[in-house]
């Protein structure tokens, strides 16, 4: 299954953190967008396990991304002058916030369409940010290590928890920090257990976004 570079209907929305207004182009309607991509696939392609990875979930501004952005804004000293990696960046709001706070940010995602939307949002918010396509499930790491690794709502599949734990560890430099936001996914505890088994404990807090409690986890490596 190949990405079709579909021109999904979009709209713009804004968020403000600190003194900075962020303008984001988002997919107008996720169900409509999924219907559009399904129309480009044969019935056989729709059954391909990889087809799910091409669904444009990246185009939604999820509460977990907003919560992570808010947390970073509230804890700017965790980011300032640090080398920062975001995995699964989607629209890129946390990366934009981290960049504005003085982080040297590399935003990454696996979906082939993310780069176009992320770079648009950089322009909309009058910012310059670096982006690279990355499948963090792969064991090879050509990116090197980072002071801070961030991610929002990345524990959405059963196969992810230990892979995420091991993947994150590969990207964090000794003495570095991992910051994740999660809406309470069912695989969260498995991930925390995997991190604990590596001798890494977490500090937990929460942020409410649109009446939804989002958990924030900070790990010191």
Predicted regions and their residues:
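S-adenosylmethionine-dependent methyltransferases
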Residues: 1-221
């Amino acid at each position: 299954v190949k990405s079709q570079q579909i021109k999904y209907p979009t709209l713009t929305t804004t968020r403000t953190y600190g003194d900075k207004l962020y303008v984001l182009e988002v997919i107008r309607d996720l169900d409509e967008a999924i219907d559009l991509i399904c129309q480009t696939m044969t019935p056989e392609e729709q059954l391909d396990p990889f087809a799910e990875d091409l669904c444009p979930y990246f185009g939604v501004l999820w509460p977990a991304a907003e919560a992570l952005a808010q947390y970073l804004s509230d804890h700017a000293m965790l980011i300032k002058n640090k080398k920062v990696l975001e995995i699964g960046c989607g629209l890129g709001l946390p990366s934009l916030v981290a960049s504005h706070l003085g982080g040297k940010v590399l935003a990454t995602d696996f979906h082939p369409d993310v780069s176009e939307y992320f770079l648009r949002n950089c322009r909309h918010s009058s910012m310059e940010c670096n982006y690279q396509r990355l499948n963090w499930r792969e064991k090879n790491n050509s990116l090197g290590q980072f002071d801070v690794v961030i991610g929002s709502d990345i524990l959405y599949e059963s196969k992810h928890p230990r892979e995420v734990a091991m993947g994150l560890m590969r990207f964090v430099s000794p003495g570095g920090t991992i910051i994740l936001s999660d809406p309470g996914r069912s695989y969260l505890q498995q991930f925390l257990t995997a991190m604990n088994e590596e001798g890494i404990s977490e500090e937990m807090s929460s942020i409410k976004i649109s009446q939804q409690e989002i958990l924030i986890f900070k790990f010191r490596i």
